[in-house]
C-alpha cells in the first residue's frame, strides 16, 4: 500500500502498542516541537517547547517568554525572559517572591534542559505579541 510522506518538521514519537479502541496500527504521539525551532546551545539541543513546559508549572508567570541566544567569547549563552503576572504585584513580600521564582526557574531549566540559562523576569506586557505564530527566539550569534 502507498506510504504518503510529508516533511512537516514536527517532532513526535511512534507508539507501537495497540490502541485501547482495538486498532493495531502504529500510532503517532503528540507533537512535542518542530525541528526548525531547535537551537543548539553548547552542544545541547534546546526546543522552545521544552522551556514552555518548565514555565507552565510555575505560578506567577504569564505564558509569554522570549529566548535570546548570544555568544560570549567561544561559548553560547541562553537568556530566558519571562513575563510576570500582575497578580504578583498585589501584596507584600514581592521582592522575596520574585527572587524565589527566579532561583526556581534557573534550577528547573538546568534540570530539564541540561544547560545553565540566564533567567530574567520582566514586567507584564513587555514582550511583543503577534497575530500569527509567536516569534520567541532571538539569535544574536554570528555563525
Question: What is each of the regions a protein language model found here?
Answer:
Residues 1-143:
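Active-site glycine/GP-rich loop and adjacent strand/helix microenvironment
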Amino acid at each position: 500500500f502507498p506510504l504518503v510522506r510529508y516533511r512537516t518538521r514536527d517532532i513526535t514519537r511512534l507508539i507501537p502498542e495497540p490502541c485501547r479502541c482495538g486498532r493495531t496500527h502504529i500510532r503517532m504521539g503528540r507533537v512535542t516541537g518542530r525541528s526548525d525551532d531547535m537551537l543548539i546551545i553548547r552542544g545541547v539541543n534546546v526546543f522552545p517547547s521544552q522551556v514552555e513546559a518548565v514555565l507552565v508549572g510555575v505560578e506567577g508567570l504569564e505564558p509569554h517568554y522570549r529566548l535570546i541566544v548570544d555568544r560570549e567569547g567561544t561559548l553560547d549563552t541562553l537568556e530566558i525572559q519571562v513575563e510576570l503576572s500582575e497578580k504578583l504585584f498585589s501584596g507584600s513580600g514581592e521582592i522575596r517572591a520574585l527572587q524565589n521564582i527566579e532561583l526556581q526557574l534557573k534550577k528547573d531549566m538546568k534540570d530539564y534542559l541540561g544547560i545553565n540559562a540566564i533567567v530574567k523576569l520582566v514586567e507584564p506586557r513587555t514582550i511583543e505579541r503577534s497575530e500569527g505564530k509567536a516569534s520567541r527566539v532571538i539569535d544574536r550569534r554570528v555563525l
